[in-house]
Amino acid sequence: MSSLPRRAKVQVQDVVLKDEFSSFSELSSASEEDDKEDSAWEPQKKVPRSRKQPPPKESKPKRMPRVKKNAPQISDGSEVVVVKEELNSSVAIADTALEDRKNKLDTVQTLKTAKTKQKCAAQPHTVRRTKKLKVEEETSKASNLEGESNSSETPSTSTVWGGTCKKEENDDDFTFGQSALKKIKTETYPQGQPVKFPANANSTKEEVEMNWDMVQVLSERTNIEPWVCANIIRLFNDDNTIPFIIRYRKELINNLDADSLREVQQTLEELRAVAKKVHSTIQKIKKEGKMSECLLKAMLNCKTFEELEHVSAPYKTGSKGTKAQRARQLGLEGAARALLEKPGELSLLSYIRPDVKGLSTLQDIEIGVQHILADMIAKDKDTLDFIRNLCQKRHVCIQSSLAKVSSKKVNEKDVDKFLLYQHFSCNIRNIHHHQILAINRGENLKVLTVKVNISDGVKDEFCRWCIQNRWRPRSFARPELMKILYNSLNDSFKRLIYPLLCREFRAKLTSDAEKESVMMFGRNLRQLLLTSPVPGRTLMGVDPGYKHGCKLAIISPTSQILHTDVVYLHCGQGFREAEKIKTLLLNFNCSTVVIGNGTACRETEAYFADLIMKNYFAPLDVVYCIVSEAGASIYSVSPEANKEMPGLDPNLRSAVSIARRVQDPLAELVKIEPKHIGVGMYQHDVSQTLLKATLDSVVEECVSFVGVDINICSEVLLRHIAGLNANRAKNIIEWREKNGPFINREQLKKVKGLGPKSFQQCAGFIRINQDYIRTFCSQQTETSGQIQGVAVTSSADVEVTNEKQGKKKSKTAVNVLLKPNPLDQTCIHPESYDIAMRFLSSIGGTLYEVGKPEMQQKINSFLEKEGMEKIAERLQTTVHTLQVIIDGLSQPESFDFRTDFDKPDFKRSIVCLEDLQIGTVLTGKVENATLFGIFVDIGVGKSGLIPIRNVTEAKLSKTKKRRSLGLGPGERVEVQVLNIDIPRSRITLDLIRVL
C-alpha cells in the first residue's frame, strides 16, 4: 500500500499448534437436544495430514515393560497417555490421543485459568513431545532481567549464543516458555544472530490467554523475526525504556532502530487490548448465561476488534436478536442442518405450525432456514479465511463521491478542499495513506460519501466454492432445497459478509494511515529536536507583530536574559526604531538576529534585510535567520514559563523562547507539548492517545541520546530522560540544591524515589562534567581535605546497609565515597565499568586520557591488531557493548552528535515570490515532511512543495537513505523551481540534492 520499503520477513515455522478449531456453525444452538442430535455434522473440510508415526518397537516375549521414574506403569496393549501437571494445580491433566479422542473443550470457569488440552500420538514405552497451544509460564521464580537487587553492577546481562546453529525438523515445536537456548529459531539473519535471553528473565506469559500465540502474531504483523519479538516482549515486561534498549541491549533486538521498536510496542499494546476486551466480553456473556463452547472458541480466536464485534454483536444486552437467532428459537436449526447432512430425509412441511408466527407457511420456514444457514456461513472460520484470501487476489477499490446534502449544511470552502476526491476511485492496495486520511476527513465533515467496492467476480467464485466444497450437501438434494442453499449464500454474502469485509478494509486502511502519519510526525519532531545548536553567541530574538509591536529579547551565550524591549517597525516609526536596535546590538555585541515565522514575519525580515544591505549595523556583520515560533505563545503563559521567567510579560517571554530555539533547540523545545510544535500531518484526525505516546517517546529518545549534564540541566529537561519522570526529576533537583553538585553517578542512588530500576535506565544518559567537578573538588579540598586526586568508583567504594523505616518497606541506603569518575562523562553504562577498565588495561590507557587524541590512537592500533570480535570474546562481553565502551572512551568531553545535523540557515538578503522564475536553482531548508511531499522554505515568504515522486533515493546521500527518505525539518536542500502559481501562492519544486 505504501511506497516506502518494508523489511523482508524471514520465514519461520509456525509457533501455534495447527489446531483448526471447529467452525462457528454451532453458535447459539436452540437446545441441548438439538446440539446432541446434530453434533455429528460439520462443514466439509480437508482432512488434516496426520504426522507420520514410526513403527512401534516389538517387545520381547519374556521382557516386562520398563517403568520410568514418576511415570505410570503401562500394560501391554494399552496406549501411552502423557500426563502433564499444570502450574499451581494439584490435579494432573491427561493428554488424549489425536486420532481417537478429539472432542469437546473443557468448560472454562474463568478466562485466565482456561487451558487447551494438548494432544499427542500414542507410542509404547516412550514419552512423546507434546504440542503447546499457549506459552507456558516458567515454574521457577523469575528475577528481573538486569539483576536490580545486586549492589555491584554486572558487566552485561546478555550473551551471544556462539554455538552452531541447529537445523530443526519440520515437526519440531517452537515455543518461548522454556529454555531460550533450545527453542529460539537459529537461522542466518542479515544483521545479527539470535541471542539467548538470561535464564532468570521473565517469560512471555500473557495475563489473558487466547487461542493464538502473541509472539507469532506480533511477528506476522511487524515482519520481525519471532526470536526478536520474544526478546522485545520480555524487555518491555521488565519495564525497560526504548532508549535503554536501543543503546545497551542492541544484541537482543537484532539492531532494530527506535521507530521499529516503537512500532512493535504499539502493536503489542493493540493485541493486548484486544485480548482484554475479549476477556471482559466473555465474562459479560457468561453472566447472562448465553455462553456456549463454540462461542468461546470463536471469541478466543479473535485478533482484532472488528472480529470480536462480528462474533459478539448478537449477544449484546438489549439486542433484539438476529434473524438467525429468532429462527433458531422457532426450532428450525435442525432443518437447516438436515438440509446439509441428510437432505433426502428433510421435509419442511412437517415444520408448519399455522398458529405460530414464523412457522405458519412453507415460505416462512424456508426463510427461517435460509437465515440460519446464512448465519452459519458468515461465522465459519474457514469460509471467512477463504473470502479474505480471495479479496487479496482480486480487485477491491475504495470510492468517494460528493455527498447528496443541501448546500446550507456544508461549507463551500470545505467542498472546494475535497475537489480531488469528489469522483475518486483507487485500489486499496495502491492508495496512499494521506489519501485515506483526506477521505476520512471529508466523510466526517459530511462532504464525501465513501464505500468499498468488491468486484462481482469475488462473489461468484465465493458462491461456487461454497457449493462445490465447503457447504456442499452430503447427499442428493432436491431442487427446492438447493434453491434455499443458493439463497442462503447470496443472503450471507450481501447482508453479513460484505459489510464485515468493508468494515475490516476501512479499519485496516485507517489504522495504517494513522500509524504512518504519527510516525511521520515523530520523525519530523526528532529532526527538529536534533537541530544543531548554535552555542557561544549572543542572540536577539524577535517576535514580530503589527499593532502591538515587535518584541525583542537579547540573551547571553549561557541563555541568560540580558535585555527585553518592544519596537514598532510597521507603524511609520521604522527609521526611529532602527537607531534603538543598532544601539542594542552594539552594546551587547550581538550580531545574530532570530525572527519568528508568525504574523508580520515577512515584513520584519524585509526590514532587517534592508538595513543589513545598507551596512547600517557596521562595524557588526549582522545576519538573521527564521525559526518556527509554533507553541511559543502557549509556553509563554504556562506555569513553567512563569516559574522560569517570573515578572516578565508573556509577550516578551515568546521572544526569549524564539532566541533560545537557535541557541539550544532541544533544551527549549522540550518545554512545549510536542503536538503544538506543528510538524505533522492530519494530527487532529489521528488517535490522540497514539500521537501523544509516540511524541513523548521521541522526546525521551532525543533527550536521552544527547544526554544531560545533571549539575546544570533544568528540571524540565531532566524529566524526559529515560527512567525518570516529573517527581524523580524534582527530587534530583532538590537533592542537588540541598547537597551540592553530584560528584559521580553512584550518588543518584541516594535520591528519594530513584530505585535500582530507575537508576539502571537513566544512568547511562546522565553526564557529570569533570572540569566542573574538579573545580568543585579543589574547593572542597581546601576546606575539608577530604578529596585527594581522582579515583574510580568501584563496588568497594560503596557500602550498602538495609535500614528499616517503621512500617515502610526497607530501603537500601547507599553511602558513596565522594570520588569523581571520568567514565561518568561518557555514554558507558555503570554496569560496564569493569569491562571498560579491563579494556583500558589491555590498550595501556588511563582514565586521564578519556576523550583525548592519545586514547583514540591507542584504541585504533589495538583494534587493527586484535579485531572487535576477538577483543569482545576476551573481555567476555558482546560486540555491541564493546562498541559503546570504545565510543565513550574516544569521544571528547564536549562531544555532541547534533553537530552532524544542519544548523539554521543564516541570511543577509530577501527574495520575493515575483522574483522567481521557472528553472531557478535555490537552496532552502525543509520546513515540514508529509506523506505526499516535502515543504521547503526558500526565503520568499511561502514554502514550496517537493512532490513525493520527486524525492528518490538517487538524490540522497548514503547516510540519508533511510525509511523517512532522509528529509526532515531543518535539513538544507538544493531545489529547482518547476512551477509558480502566483494567484494561489503555490510553488512546485524538484529536489536536486541534499546539502
Swiss-Prot record:
The keyword Ubl conjugation applies. Gene3D superfamilies: Nucleic acid-binding proteins (2.40.50.140), RuvA domain 2-like (1.10.10.650), Tex N-terminal region-like (1.10.3500.10), Tex RuvX-like domain-like (1.10.150.310), YqgF/RNase H-like domain (3.30.420.140). Residues 146-159 have a biased composition (Low complexity). There is a cross-link at residue 185 (Glycyl lysine isopeptide (Lys-Gly) (interchain with G-Cter in SUMO1)). GO terms for molecular function: mRNA binding; structural constituent of ribosome. Pfam families: HHH_3, HHH_9, S1, Tex_central_region, Tex_N, Tex_YqgF. Residues 919-992 form the S1 motif domain. There is a cross-link at residues 84, 134, 166-167, 183, 185, 955 (Glycyl lysine isopeptide (Lys-Gly) (interchain with G-Cter in SUMO2)). PROSITE patterns: S1. Residues 258-288 form a coiled coil. Residues 23-81, 120-165 are annotated as: Disordered. The modification Phosphoserine is found at residues 861, 964. CDD domains: S1_Tex. SMART domains: S1, YqgFc. Keywords: Coiled coil, Isopeptide bond, Phosphoprotein, RNA-binding, Ubl conjugation. InterPro entries: HHH_9, NA-bd_OB-fold, Ribos_protein_bS1-like, RNaseH-like_sf, RuvA_2-like, S1_domain, S1_Tex, Tex-like_central_region. GO terms for biological process: nucleobase-containing compound metabolic process; translation. This is S1 RNA-binding domain-containing protein 1.
